[in-house]
């Protein structure tokens, strides 16, 4: 699933191409998945924002077109065999590429996210000033859940998913199975720094393109952070720090990659 770095990369690439353009039409054949998109048509794009894993096209007249990329969605500048919707602008068309069809588009009045409840409960953006250590530490101390499960929750840090939770926990040398409230202040600071560092590096490199090639930047180029993955997707390969094979187990229903030596064996 595209996470914060992939969605932020998409936002940065699309913004200069669409700002000031009029969204003439949203073309699709699935009104259940792409809801109320007619509300966005005929309006000029004023800004392209991001919250967590959501893209928000701010349109004139107090309207937003909200995009959630799902498991495999993304915007492309050229059509693909998996194009599910198209945003027709004045000078170009953006194609919504989504092989597994979990992506969504919503036309809404600005800030009215009743149809998108996840947007209403997102925590702070981990690369913003609002993501301060005291609140992060308090959130850890208030939860008995495993660290990996809490990081995926979106209320502690918006936009963190499987890839970057695993990578941040490895960099902080913390077990994904540890109860969050068991962390000392020093351990929590390590995780706080690691999370910000990993996400910032991934944004700088355009996100991660995995072996399924489902995520690519709008121009079709792959991301580059996958070359820096220490544990994610590396089951059985040597840990870059100690050489022990990386292991994969399930936490909160999600495959989790970690080094038993550097991070602890777990249950």
From Swiss-Prot:
PROSITE patterns according to UniProt: FPG_CAT, ZF_FPG_1, ZF_FPG_2
Key words, A-Z: DNA damage, DNA repair, DNA-binding, Glycosidase, Hydrolase, Lyase, Metal-binding, Multifunctional enzyme, Zinc, Zinc-finger
Assembly mode: Monomer.
Listed GO biological process terms: base-excision repair
Name of the protein in its database record: Formamidopyrimidine-DNA glycosylase
Keyword Transcription assigned: no
Source organism: Thermus thermophilus (strain ATCC 27634 / DSM 579 / HB8)
ZnF endpoints (FPG-type): 230-264
């Amino acid at each position: 699933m595209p996470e914060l770095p992939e969605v932020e990369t998409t936002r940065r690439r699309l913004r200069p191409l669409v700002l000031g353009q009029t969204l003439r039409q949203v073309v699709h054949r699935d009104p259940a998945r792409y809801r109320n998109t007619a509300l966005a048509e005929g309006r000029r794009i004023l800004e392209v924002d991001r919250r967590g894993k959501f893209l928000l096209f701010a349109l004139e007249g107090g309207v937003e077109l909200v995009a959630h990329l799902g498991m495999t969605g993304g915007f492309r500048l050229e059509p693909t065999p998996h194009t599910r919707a198209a945003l027709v602008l004045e000078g170009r068309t953006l194609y919504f590429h989504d092989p597994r069809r979990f992506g969504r588009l919503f036309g809404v009045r600005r800030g009215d996210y009743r149809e998108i409840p996840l947007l209403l409960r997102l925590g702070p953006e981990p690369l913003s000033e609002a993501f301060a250590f005291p609140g992060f530490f308090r959130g850890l101390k208030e939860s008995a859940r495993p660290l990996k499960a809490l990081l995926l929750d979106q209320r502690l840090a918006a936009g963190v998913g499987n890839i970057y939770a695993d990578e941040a926990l490895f960099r902080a040398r913390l077990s994904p199975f540890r109860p969050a409230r068991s962390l000392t202040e020093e351990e929590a600071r390590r995780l706080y720094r690691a999370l910000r560092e990993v996400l910032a590096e991934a944004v700088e490199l355009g996100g991660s393109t995995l072996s399924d090639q489902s995520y690519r930047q709008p121009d079709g180029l792959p991301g580059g952070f996958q070359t820096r993955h220490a544990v994610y997707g590396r089951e059985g390969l040597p840990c870059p720090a100690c050489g022990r094979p990386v292991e994969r187990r399930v936490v909160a229903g999600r495959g989790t990659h970690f080094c038993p030596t550097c991070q602890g064996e777990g249950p």
